[in-house]
Amino acid sequence: MQKLLTYFFLLMFLLQTEAYAQSEIESIKKSISANTIFIRHALAPGFGDPPDFTKEDCSTQRNLNNKGRLQAQLIGDYLKKSNLLFSEILTSEWCRCIDTAKELDIGQWETFSGLNSFFEGHEKKDTVMAKLRKKLASRKPSDLVLFVTHQVVITELTDEVPRSGEMVLYNSITKQKSRFMVDF
């Protein structure tokens, strides 16, 4: 009987913990009426990209390591449990962002050049940001969109500097924002 009670209380604790975790991101979303969630790609050791960078060749890029893949999977698990429904999932054309989107495993995604990094001049900042702003302006404010991108893109739009795997919930109308990190 004692063992049964122990299991019961452990189960109740786990259910409460999960319910809290699920409601935290939903609460933030609701508090600012976020219609966009930016996520910086998961852990990819290093800085920038190698000198021989080619967008179409992942071997010339800084990529996710095993810890980064695990991080993206755990973020995906968290998002699945949160019951957030994304009308669209878009990712930068960089391999570390594409791999993050794949590892999230939360739905169909497409690449979008309006999320590409302009750090080190591989893309033109004005071009990238114009595409992103046009995308934000062209959709229904009630739709929730997930963008997998780079720190420079998120910072340029929101003035936030997210860590790898960190999310910035954003209201594209009011410009309100809030950062959120799934610990792993």
Question: Where do the model's predicted regions map?
Answer:
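Bacterial N-terminal signal peptides
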Residues: 7-16
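A short, acidic, amphipathic alpha-helical segment used as a generic capping/interface helix at domain edges
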Residues: 129-138
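Active-site-proximal alpha-helix that buttresses catalytic centers in soluble enzyme cores
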Residues: 22-122, 160-184
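Bacterial Sec-dependent signal peptides at the C-terminal "C-region" and cleavage site
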Residues: 15-23
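Alpha-helical scaffold elements lining the catalytic groove of polysaccharide deacetylases
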Residues: 122-128
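Generic beta-sheet signal
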Residues: 34-37, 141-149
